[in-house]
Amino acid sequence: MVFSRFFRVTGVNLSRRVYSRISSSSSPSLESIPWIHKASNFTLYGSFHASSVETQVSANDASQDAERICKILTKFTDSKVETLLNEASVKLSPALIEEVLKKLSNAGVLALSVFKWAENQKGFKHTTSNYNALIESLGKIKQFKLIWSLVDDMKAKKLLSKETFALISRRYARARKVKEAIGAFHKMEEFGFKMESSDFNRMLDTLSKSRNVGDAQKVFDKMKKKRFEPDIKSYTILLEGWGQELNLLRVDEVNREMKDEGFEPDVVAYGIIINAHCKAKKYEEAIRFFNEMEQRNCKPSPHIFCSLINGLGSEKKLNDALEFFERSKSSGFPLEAPTYNALVGAYCWSQRMEDAYKTVDEMRLKGVGPNARTYDIILHHLIRMQRSKEAYEVYQTMSCEPTVSTYEIMVRMFCNKERLDMAIKIWDEMKGKGVLPGMHMFSSLITALCHENKLDEACEYFNEMLDVGIRPPGHMFSRLKQTLLDEGRKDKVTDLVVKMDRLRKTQLVG
């Protein structure tokens, strides 16, 4: 059986802290759950979850030290951040701080603390990349006043770049502040930069990718041939934006205008058009554009094959998906992980898990994976098919490091199964590796804790969420407040509301 070849036997040890946390809860202990106990006897070509792996040395010292710092910072609720960092005993460098700030991109308050700590170390100077990483993190919690203060600081230190303004614009756009997003690009001229066609395209791209393609189209129509001459990239950005909205009528209009202006679709434009039709489930049209591209001697890219395999596979048109996979093999491009992942997904949609596992074996033989995305696809489909036992086995035996997305899938699965002890076990594994949870993972766990009436624990995680600077979604906060009120804990609700208002209104100080 292919599934049995997918694994080899090993033992999996629980840390004493995690085990005591699970066994002390009202739920049964880990060993009392038959399918989980069985699952712990498998591993996939070397597990990254066993405690012995923690002694492995990373090839990149900065990356290794950054991971260690993030692990230390998960304890920040018990100590001051500065104290923890002073005790970290790492070799400080701009590259290290940049790596840490990127890992803290979902924790703006922590990121700012690390930035300020490094700045106060003797002889240390931040780079443009460090500032940009902090701006990205602060933008996620809408600390725009502080961000512009950092821009002034960068200007004084001659560290400003056009990338800085693009980052700020993107954060405004994702906060649905379209006027400010456009203004951020124009503001670069106030700081001595000349706005060029590439910046115009970047503005369009920022708006389009934040689901504001209508505004991007207005900017395009207003500015074309007045300040900027659009090029084929300008049109492909709009094609992609309208494609994301599944507005094929506008995709067709932009395509026609592009041709009228003398720009024939290139492989990028065709890829976007084909992907848009696949997402809209217009597969005959997608294939028609594919054939048109080949007739024009425009060679399909691996991305185009991925779009078709993904789309056809999701509609359980497995034979058609397999045909395009075979065509991709003979296209002249080496097969890469995304193409294999598309095939894995196609098999999963048709519930042919044996073939999905065979594909993973082939990826390994070819040296192109599997990667975390491969496992995320398999886990998603196993959970969709109510095969939780198998999903946990696959998770335990991953041959690469899980990403925050992988952890989120597993935490959500156990929350939905009302196995909070296991959800918290996965959570602790993740934080033990220096990976910080995002908003959706906090929301899943807190909502599940409310459902189980574990309100003290729910409040504990809610406070942790606020402490790192993550704003909770409204529906989750409402659920927590109502559950507390139902239990007569009005004082606790008042405390949380005050803390939420403080996070919402308080501007961090740089």
From Swiss-Prot:
Q: Which organism is it from?
A: Arabidopsis thaliana
UniProt keyword annotations, A-Z: Mitochondrion, Repeat, Transit peptide
Q: Where are the PPR repeats?
A: 127-157, 161-195, 196-230, 231-265, 266-300, 301-335, 336-370, 371-401, 403-437, 438-472
Q: Where is the transit peptide?
A: 1-14
Asked if the Swiss-Prot or TrEMBL record annotates the protein with the keyword Mitochondrion, the reply is yes
> Belongs to which family?
Belongs to the PPR family. P subfamily.
Q: Which residues cross the membrane?
A: none
Q: Which domain of life is it from?
A: Eukaryota
The UniProt entry's GO CC annotations, sorted and at most eight, read: mitochondrion
InterPro entries hit by this protein: Mito_RNA_Proc_CCM1, Pentatricopeptide_rpt, TPR-like_helical_dom_sf
Stored Gene3D superfamilies: Tetratricopeptide repeat domain
Q: Pfam families annotated for this entry?
A: PPR (PF01535), PPR_2 (PF13041)
Q: What is this protein called?
A: Pentatricopeptide repeat-containing protein At1g71060, mitochondrial
Localization of this protein: Mitochondrion
